[in-house]
Amino acid sequence: MISGSIDRYSPLALCVALAAVAATFLASPVRAATDSETRTTAPFHAVAFAGSWTVDVKVGGENSVVIEGKKDLIAKVKTEVVDGELRVGIDNGLLSFFSHQDLDGLTAHITVPELTGFALRGSGKADIGGLNGGKTAFELDGSGNLNAKGKLDTLGLVVNGSGTVDLSGLETAKASVTINGSGDATIDPRETLAAVINGSGQVAYVHEGVKVTSVIHGSGMVEKK
């Protein structure tokens, strides 16, 4: 009886069965270990990041910084406040705050009482919410994506490269926008818009009745969305 059972499993059948088990194992997703770490910093009112970040910024509340992602990457992240600006970069023993080392998989959760400035360099993505009055200067260098919502009195924006900025949900009285390269920006000024484009960039505004002044060098354009 035992002999007959063994005979039914030929070498070919065993190979097929083992291959099926291996394929199932390889197809199963392998989840990398993730962790989070809260950083203690001096007070700050501006933020600067570089690399392939996902950054969530909440305006309104006490300063806080939480880094989330793979443990080995979190350990390399350096946070420091210089003249009221929170800088986040990779600590590799060199001048690294604005290194474009790949940080894919990391997310920074930031809370700030007020946001006077925000800079994103590289190919990261930033979402900012809760802006409420005052003046904020934004800068996007590279191919990243920047989104912000809320309300401001005055908005300043500089885009260097091919990045995309969506501020259609950020109402502002006055806006000043400069694009160097092929980037594009959508904004919502209600009174005035001053735009400068050097290259093929595009600026779109969403509200009627805005007084627009523009200087364009190249094939760029300013238009009502």
Report residues per predicted region.
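Short helix-to-loop capping/linker segments positioned immediately adjacent to catalytic or ligand/cofactor-binding
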Residues: 124-128, 144-147, 162-165
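Short, surface-exposed interaction patches in beta-rich subdomains
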Residues: 148-225
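Acidic (Asp/Glu) and glycine-rich low-complexity loops/linkers
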Residues: 2-9, 28-121, 127-139, 149-156, ...
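Bacterial N-terminal signal peptides
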Residues: 13-27
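Short, recurring structural edge motifs at helix starts
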Residues: 33-35, 123, 143, 182, ...
